[in-house]
């Protein structure tokens, strides 16, 4: 099986890039991921391989969910437990005060990413500059948090567990930092696990060890999701074999003439996903006045 998606349970202490590197060796093909996880984070890391690497942005743009433990009383330069302590407080938030403060973080908010992030500043990663001791000034960004739920509060360990569901570009470490400042007690991420990226959840996750076993037993298909799993946000149009050949040669087609399933009227949408009958991927196309122009062709 040369194309598709895997839902990897990224282990603690391993970078997303390292996971990609291991899978390249294991699968012997092109591999990419949809959404970086910090080394200290665990959980859902969608991996595309083969022609599915052309669809990673569609997974990156989906909703994501995280479960995070915030440690109160300290602010750290990395906004997580691996950083240096830069401020402390003896104040501790109550469950009521946390719930009230969380309301400020739901919806479209302005967020300044962590200075220990992968954002590029003058051609260098922010975390590289920060580790060199250089001051990093990042501009606020508009991001969307759809839901924050307080799961538990532990007064003994001075921690709180939250579930955060959000869109693209949200830094959970920055949420912990800002929430601690709002509450006047400071805070940082002590534990972080991603539980969902669009269609990929903990219910359909696989560890690297489990995947290695499946590959060794020639059972990789048991863990593979089709390339089209991240295409649910686009209108899906089936075309015949001859029309598919035309599209794969880079030529435009009139959807009213080519569609097999009658979905050739694409309203309020400028993109569509084409496949042959049976689900064989053909292309992602730009739609203009009923004409589909291929922008990503799948060689499967």
UniProtKB/Swiss-Prot annotation:
Gene3D superfamilies: Pseudouridine synthase. GO terms for biological process: mRNA pseudouridine synthesis; tRNA pseudouridine synthesis. Pfam families: TruB_C_2, TruB_N. The keyword DNA-binding does not apply. One of its GO terms (molecular function) is RNA binding. It catalyses: uridine(55) in tRNA = pseudouridine(55) in tRNA. It comes from the Bacteria. Its EC number is 5.4.99.25. CDD domains: PseudoU_synth_EcTruB. Keywords: Isomerase, tRNA processing. The keyword Isomerase applies. The active site is at 38 (nucleophile). Responsible for synthesis of pseudouridine from uracil-55 in the psi GC loop of transfer RNAs. NCBIfam families: TruB. Belongs to the pseudouridine synthase TruB family. Type 1 subfamily. This is tRNA pseudouridine synthase B. It comes from Anaplasma phagocytophilum (strain HZ). The lineage of its organism: Bacteria, Pseudomonadati, Pseudomonadota, Alphaproteobacteria, Rickettsiales. The gene is truB.
